[in-house]
Swiss-Prot record:
PANTHER family: HYDROGENASE MATURATION FACTOR HYBG (PTHR35177:SF2). PROSITE patterns: HUPF_HYPC. Pathway: Protein modification; [NiFe] hydrogenase maturation. Involved in the maturation of [NiFe] hydrogenases. Involved in the biosynthesis of the Fe(CN)(2)CO cofactor. Pfam families: HupF_HypC. The gene is hypC. One of its GO terms (biological process) is protein maturation. This is Hydrogenase maturation factor HypC. It comes from the Bacteria. InterPro entries: Hydgase_assmbl_chp_CS, Hydrogenase_HupF/HypC. Belongs to the HupF/HypC family.
Length: 75
C-alpha cells in the first residue's frame, strides 16, 4: 500500500525543490509536478515528490486522521 501525506512548504529552493515539514521533521522534495507552489502551501507528498496542492483545512483533517490511526495502532 502506498501513502501520500500532506506536508507544509517552508522554503522554496532552486530547481523546483522545496523544504517541507511534518511534525517538526524537514525534508527536501521536488515540486516539479505542481504549478505555482508558495511558502505556506500544503502539498501531498509521495516518495519525495509533491503531487498536488491541498487546502490547509483538508491537510489538517487528513493529518489528524493519520495521527489518530497511528495512536490507535500503538495502544
Amino acid at each position: 500500500m502506498c501513502l501520500a501525506i500532506p506536508v507544509q512548504v517552508k522554503e522554496l529552493l532552486p530547481d523546483n525543490m522545496a523544504k517541507v515539514t511534518l511534525d517538526g521533521v524537514s525534508k527536501i522534495v521536488s515540486t516539479a509536478l505542481v504549478d505555482d507552489v508558495k511558502v505556506g502551501d500544503y502539498v501531498v507528498l509521495h516518495v519525495g515528490y509533491a503531487l498536488a496542492k491541498i487546502d490547509p483545512e483538508e491537510a489538517e483533517r487528513t493529518l489528524a486522521l493519520i495521527r489518530e490511526r497511528a495512536m490507535g495502532d500503538a495502544a
